[in-house]
Amino acid sequence: MAPAFFDTRGTSPRVRERSGDIPVPEKESKPTRLTKRWSRIPLGLSLIVLSLFALTGCKPPKVSPIIFRVMTYNIHHGEGLDGKVDLDRIAKVITNANADTVALQEVDQNTKRTGGIDMAAELAKRTNMHVAFGANLDFQGGKYGTAILSKHPIESYENHVLKQARDGEPRGVLQAVLDVGQGRLLFAGTHLDHTRDQGERLFSQTQFDELFAKYEDLPIIFCGDFNDTPGSELHKRMSENWFDSWELVGQGPGLTMTSDNPTRRIDYVWVSDKKNFKLRWTDVPKTDASDHLPVVAEMEFKPAP
């Protein structure tokens, strides 16, 4: 297996793209003792008892909410502020957070610059989690994209490469349906355009409704590096259909970029609603394992059957 450390100083940490002004788009048993007992009760009496249950409004016990912890983390292809690629360091950040599910951005798969390592698979081994990888770009003999790690089984997943308003680095949305024991949820991750012009990010956002429509019966968590700050047009449009976990329960500014001296909040954990999700807390752990800081959020949620 390739070594875990690589010195990538002197190479471009990200794929460069052409900038330009982009028009902003518009907007399934055996009988139990109880059932045997009920079988000896005359039918008429059974009907009376059942009617009483109906009249009194008795219902089956509700499923208790699940405590669920998520993380989003742009790992900068495993490269820390020291210019070295160290997957053990990244894995430690993930493990220390004890997250149930993690959305990762800037993930290399078999590229030359990181020694041909399948980063998503290696991080899954180091953290003992299930994994899904979404490739958005062919790069240096391999692939580059996003990934999802999960302690819970991944029932299905799909990666959508987004349409672009101009030539540049392709972006995508990776969606995974998770079986959390008592039910299911959809966990998704993305990494949007990083250039100053907001047009490409807004064009990406216009595609989200269609991508999530087939999962409208599931509670949804949508994480990632959105490369835009609170108060931006992107954040305003996202807030029309999603709830920003930091705005709900975060303390302080929640800055995530750059990790040694963060001045911007561009990494987010969004939830689809406040009926199925009750945020408990959110945090930005300090680490120099990447140029971004991770965001961790814990919540109570009601899974879909």
Please annotate each region the language model reported.
Residues 27, 40-44, 49-126, 138-143, ...:
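N-terminal, active-site-proximal structural segment of metallo-dependent hydrolase catalytic domains
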Residues 59-60, 177, 199, 206, ...:
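Metal-dependent phosphoester-hydrolase catalytic domains
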Residues 103-105, 132-135, 221-225, 244-246:
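Active-site neighborhood of phospho(di)ester-bond hydrolases with catalytic His/Asp-centered motifs
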Residues 77-82, 109-110, 165, 196-200, ...:
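Short, flexible loop segments at the rims of nucleotide/cofactor-binding pockets, characterized by
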Residues 1-46:
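Intrinsic disorder/low-complexity segments
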